[in-house]
Amino acid sequence: NGLFMHIVGEQTSFTMPEGTMAYYERWAQGPYELRPLKGWGKEESERPLTLKLPDGLSVALLEAEMVDYVRGKFRLSAEKPSTLETSLYSSVDIISPYSTPWRVIMVGERPVDLINNNDLVLNLNPACKLADTSWIKPGKVFRSGDLKHDRVKAAIDFAAERGIQYVHMDAGWYGPEMKMSSDATTVSPDKDLDIPALCKYAESKGIGLMVYVNQRALVQQLDTLLPLYKKWGLKGVKFGFV
Protein backbone atom coordinates (compact mmCIF):
# COMPACT_ATOMS: atom_id res chain seq x y z
CA ASN A 1 0.00 0.00 0.00
CA GLY A 2 1.04 3.58 -0.59
CA LEU A 3 2.87 2.81 -3.83
CA PHE A 4 2.68 5.70 -6.30
CA MET A 5 1.97 4.67 -9.88
CA HIS A 6 1.93 6.65 -13.11
CA ILE A 7 -0.29 4.76 -15.58
CA VAL A 8 0.17 5.75 -19.21
CA GLY A 9 -1.80 3.01 -20.95
CA GLU A 10 -3.60 -0.32 -20.77
CA GLN A 11 -3.14 -3.61 -22.58
CA THR A 12 -6.87 -4.43 -22.55
CA SER A 13 -7.98 -5.52 -26.02
CA PHE A 14 -10.98 -7.16 -27.67
CA THR A 15 -10.58 -9.42 -30.72
CA MET A 16 -13.73 -9.82 -32.81
CA PRO A 17 -14.61 -12.17 -35.69
CA GLU A 18 -13.55 -11.07 -39.16
CA GLY A 19 -16.36 -9.11 -40.79
CA THR A 20 -17.52 -7.42 -37.58
CA MET A 21 -19.00 -3.94 -38.11
CA ALA A 22 -18.80 -1.13 -35.55
CA TYR A 23 -21.19 1.76 -34.92
CA TYR A 24 -18.28 4.18 -34.78
CA GLU A 25 -18.69 7.54 -33.03
CA ARG A 26 -15.68 9.82 -33.04
CA TRP A 27 -16.83 12.15 -30.25
CA ALA A 28 -19.68 12.42 -27.76
CA GLN A 29 -22.89 13.51 -29.54
CA GLY A 30 -21.17 12.92 -32.87
CA PRO A 31 -22.73 11.12 -35.85
CA TYR A 32 -22.63 7.34 -35.93
CA GLU A 33 -20.97 5.54 -38.83
CA LEU A 34 -21.21 1.81 -39.52
CA ARG A 35 -17.57 0.87 -40.15
CA PRO A 36 -15.57 -2.35 -40.53
CA LEU A 37 -12.78 -2.99 -38.03
CA LYS A 38 -10.14 -1.75 -40.45
CA GLY A 39 -8.91 1.51 -41.91
CA TRP A 40 -9.47 3.75 -38.88
CA GLY A 41 -5.91 5.06 -38.90
CA LYS A 42 -5.29 6.93 -35.66
CA GLU A 43 -8.97 7.69 -35.12
CA GLU A 44 -10.69 6.48 -31.95
CA SER A 45 -14.31 5.68 -31.15
CA GLU A 46 -16.30 6.76 -28.12
CA ARG A 47 -17.69 4.30 -25.62
CA PRO A 48 -19.95 2.47 -25.36
CA LEU A 49 -19.13 0.95 -28.74
CA THR A 50 -21.81 -1.25 -30.29
CA LEU A 51 -20.73 -3.97 -32.71
CA LYS A 52 -22.60 -6.09 -35.24
CA LEU A 53 -21.07 -9.57 -35.57
CA PRO A 54 -21.24 -11.63 -38.79
CA ASP A 55 -23.41 -14.28 -37.09
CA GLY A 56 -26.02 -11.65 -36.18
CA LEU A 57 -25.12 -11.18 -32.52
CA SER A 58 -24.89 -7.67 -31.07
CA VAL A 59 -22.03 -6.70 -28.77
CA ALA A 60 -21.43 -3.59 -26.67
CA LEU A 61 -18.03 -2.65 -25.22
CA LEU A 62 -18.17 -0.22 -22.33
CA GLU A 63 -16.81 0.67 -18.90
CA ALA A 64 -18.21 0.89 -15.37
CA GLU A 65 -17.08 2.15 -11.95
CA MET A 66 -14.72 4.77 -13.34
CA VAL A 67 -13.53 6.39 -10.10
CA ASP A 68 -10.38 8.54 -9.88
CA TYR A 69 -9.41 7.37 -13.35
CA VAL A 70 -9.67 8.62 -16.93
CA ARG A 71 -12.16 7.70 -19.61
CA GLY A 72 -11.22 5.14 -22.20
CA LYS A 73 -11.92 5.10 -25.93
CA PHE A 74 -11.36 2.42 -28.56
CA ARG A 75 -8.76 2.29 -31.32
CA LEU A 76 -7.81 -0.45 -33.75
CA SER A 77 -4.73 -2.51 -33.02
CA ALA A 78 -1.88 -1.90 -35.45
CA GLU A 79 -0.72 -5.50 -35.01
CA LYS A 80 -3.79 -7.73 -34.62
CA PRO A 81 -6.64 -7.82 -37.17
CA SER A 82 -10.21 -7.11 -36.01
CA THR A 83 -8.90 -6.13 -32.59
CA LEU A 84 -9.91 -3.11 -30.53
CA GLU A 85 -7.61 -1.68 -27.88
CA THR A 86 -8.44 0.55 -24.91
CA SER A 87 -7.00 4.03 -25.37
CA LEU A 88 -6.79 6.22 -22.25
CA TYR A 89 -7.66 9.89 -22.57
CA SER A 90 -4.60 10.83 -20.51
CA SER A 91 -2.20 9.35 -17.99
CA VAL A 92 -3.31 8.51 -14.44
CA ASP A 93 -1.46 9.24 -11.20
CA ILE A 94 -2.67 6.86 -8.52
CA ILE A 95 -1.65 5.44 -5.14
CA SER A 96 -2.18 1.78 -4.27
CA PRO A 97 -4.41 0.08 -3.41
CA TYR A 98 -6.47 1.09 -6.42
CA SER A 99 -8.99 -0.31 -8.86
CA THR A 100 -9.20 0.27 -12.58
CA PRO A 101 -12.64 0.60 -14.20
CA TRP A 102 -14.54 -2.48 -15.30
CA ARG A 103 -14.12 -3.27 -18.98
CA VAL A 104 -17.47 -4.72 -19.96
CA ILE A 105 -18.53 -6.98 -22.84
CA MET A 106 -22.28 -7.27 -23.34
CA VAL A 107 -23.67 -9.76 -25.88
CA GLY A 108 -27.23 -10.09 -27.14
CA GLU A 109 -29.05 -11.99 -29.85
CA ARG A 110 -30.75 -8.71 -30.82
CA PRO A 111 -29.63 -5.07 -30.39
CA VAL A 112 -32.52 -4.43 -28.00
CA ASP A 113 -31.17 -7.12 -25.67
CA LEU A 114 -28.29 -4.79 -24.80
CA ILE A 115 -30.75 -2.18 -23.54
CA ASN A 116 -33.01 -4.70 -21.82
CA ASN A 117 -30.08 -5.99 -19.78
CA ASN A 118 -28.37 -2.70 -18.96
CA ASP A 119 -28.83 -3.43 -15.25
CA LEU A 120 -25.51 -5.24 -15.65
CA VAL A 121 -23.81 -1.84 -15.85
CA LEU A 122 -25.79 -0.55 -12.88
CA ASN A 123 -24.71 -3.50 -10.76
CA LEU A 124 -21.04 -3.05 -11.65
CA ASN A 125 -21.10 0.51 -10.33
CA PRO A 126 -21.01 1.35 -6.61
CA ALA A 127 -24.28 1.63 -4.73
CA CYS A 128 -25.69 5.12 -4.30
CA LYS A 129 -24.19 6.89 -1.27
CA LEU A 130 -27.23 9.13 -0.77
CA ALA A 131 -29.58 7.91 1.95
CA ASP A 132 -32.51 9.93 0.56
CA THR A 133 -33.02 10.13 -3.20
CA SER A 134 -36.69 11.11 -3.13
CA TRP A 135 -35.84 14.63 -4.31
CA ILE A 136 -34.33 13.32 -7.56
CA LYS A 137 -36.96 13.37 -10.30
CA PRO A 138 -35.71 11.57 -13.44
CA GLY A 139 -37.23 12.35 -16.80
CA LYS A 140 -36.72 13.18 -20.45
CA VAL A 141 -35.19 16.54 -21.37
CA PHE A 142 -35.80 18.78 -24.40
CA ARG A 143 -32.93 21.11 -25.25
CA SER A 144 -33.70 24.72 -26.15
CA GLY A 145 -30.73 26.13 -28.03
CA ASP A 146 -32.58 29.28 -29.14
CA LEU A 147 -32.07 31.49 -26.09
CA LYS A 148 -34.96 33.91 -26.50
CA HIS A 149 -37.76 34.25 -23.97
CA ASP A 150 -40.56 33.40 -26.40
CA ARG A 151 -38.62 30.50 -27.90
CA VAL A 152 -37.97 28.94 -24.48
CA LYS A 153 -41.70 29.30 -23.72
CA ALA A 154 -42.42 27.55 -27.01
CA ALA A 155 -40.03 24.77 -25.99
CA ILE A 156 -41.89 24.43 -22.68
CA ASP A 157 -45.19 24.14 -24.57
CA PHE A 158 -43.63 21.55 -26.87
CA ALA A 159 -42.43 19.49 -23.90
CA ALA A 160 -45.78 19.69 -22.13
CA GLU A 161 -47.67 18.54 -25.22
CA ARG A 162 -45.39 15.52 -25.68
CA GLY A 163 -44.93 14.25 -22.14
CA ILE A 164 -41.35 15.50 -21.76
CA GLN A 165 -40.53 16.38 -18.17
CA TYR A 166 -37.80 19.02 -18.52
CA VAL A 167 -36.58 21.82 -20.79
CA HIS A 168 -32.88 22.64 -20.81
CA MET A 169 -31.42 26.06 -21.72
CA ASP A 170 -28.00 25.45 -23.22
CA ALA A 171 -24.73 27.38 -23.29
CA GLY A 172 -24.66 31.14 -23.79
CA TRP A 173 -27.42 32.38 -21.53
CA TYR A 174 -25.01 34.01 -19.05
CA GLY A 175 -22.27 34.89 -21.56
CA PRO A 176 -19.38 33.11 -23.28
CA GLU A 177 -18.99 29.84 -21.38
CA MET A 178 -15.22 29.59 -21.92
CA LYS A 179 -14.46 32.96 -20.28
CA MET A 180 -13.65 32.99 -16.58
CA SER A 181 -15.21 36.45 -16.37
CA SER A 182 -18.68 35.26 -17.42
CA ASP A 183 -21.06 35.58 -14.46
CA ALA A 184 -23.51 32.68 -14.12
CA THR A 185 -25.55 34.58 -11.52
CA THR A 186 -26.92 36.93 -14.18
CA VAL A 187 -28.41 36.69 -17.65
CA SER A 188 -26.20 38.07 -20.40
CA PRO A 189 -27.36 41.59 -21.40
CA ASP A 190 -27.81 40.49 -25.02
CA LYS A 191 -30.28 37.75 -24.05
CA ASP A 192 -34.01 38.39 -23.77
CA LEU A 193 -34.57 36.00 -20.87
CA ASP A 194 -36.44 36.29 -17.58
CA ILE A 195 -35.49 33.01 -15.95
CA PRO A 196 -37.67 33.28 -12.80
CA ALA A 197 -40.68 34.06 -15.02
CA LEU A 198 -39.84 31.15 -17.30
CA CYS A 199 -39.57 28.86 -14.27
CA LYS A 200 -43.05 29.89 -13.14
CA TYR A 201 -44.44 29.35 -16.63
CA ALA A 202 -42.77 25.95 -16.84
CA GLU A 203 -44.13 24.95 -13.44
CA SER A 204 -47.65 25.91 -14.55
CA LYS A 205 -47.23 23.41 -17.39
CA GLY A 206 -45.77 20.68 -15.18
CA ILE A 207 -42.31 21.17 -16.68
CA GLY A 208 -38.98 21.67 -14.89
CA LEU A 209 -36.49 24.17 -16.31
CA MET A 210 -32.75 23.44 -16.29
CA VAL A 211 -29.70 25.48 -17.30
CA TYR A 212 -26.19 24.73 -18.53
CA VAL A 213 -23.19 26.08 -16.60
CA ASN A 214 -19.58 25.55 -17.64
CA GLN A 215 -17.05 24.37 -15.07
CA ARG A 216 -15.24 27.71 -15.29
CA ALA A 217 -18.17 29.36 -13.56
CA LEU A 218 -18.90 26.36 -11.35
CA VAL A 219 -15.46 26.27 -9.72
CA GLN A 220 -15.77 29.96 -8.85
CA GLN A 221 -19.46 30.32 -8.02
CA LEU A 222 -21.01 26.95 -7.12
CA ASP A 223 -21.88 27.81 -3.51
CA THR A 224 -23.57 31.00 -4.73
CA LEU A 225 -25.26 29.49 -7.76
CA LEU A 226 -27.15 26.63 -6.15
CA PRO A 227 -29.20 28.67 -3.64
CA LEU A 228 -29.78 31.35 -6.28
CA TYR A 229 -31.02 28.86 -8.86
CA LYS A 230 -33.31 27.30 -6.26
CA LYS A 231 -34.73 30.77 -5.59
CA TRP A 232 -35.30 31.30 -9.31
CA GLY A 233 -37.16 27.99 -9.49
CA LEU A 234 -34.71 26.01 -11.60
CA LYS A 235 -34.89 22.24 -11.24
CA GLY A 236 -31.44 21.22 -12.38
CA VAL A 237 -28.00 22.17 -13.68
CA LYS A 238 -26.10 20.57 -16.53
CA PHE A 239 -22.42 20.69 -15.52
CA GLY A 240 -20.20 21.57 -18.47
CA PHE A 241 -17.21 19.31 -19.15
CA VAL A 242 -16.72 17.91 -15.67
Language model features: what each stretch is:
Residues Q11, P48-T50, I156, C199, ...:
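Short amphipathic alpha-helical segments and helix-helix/interface helices
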Residues E18, G108, D146, W173, ...:
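Short, flexible loop/turn elements at secondary-structure junctions
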Residues N1-L124:
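N-terminal accessory beta-strand-rich subdomains and adjacent acidic, glycine-rich linkers
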Residues S90-V92, A155, A197-L198:
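Generic recognition of flexible, low-complexity loop/linker segments
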Residues A171-V242:
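Aromatic- and carboxylate-enriched substrate-binding clefts and catalytic-loop regions
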Residues F14, L49-L51, V59-L61, W102-M106, ...:
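Generic structural hydrophobic/aromatic packing signal, biased to beta-strands
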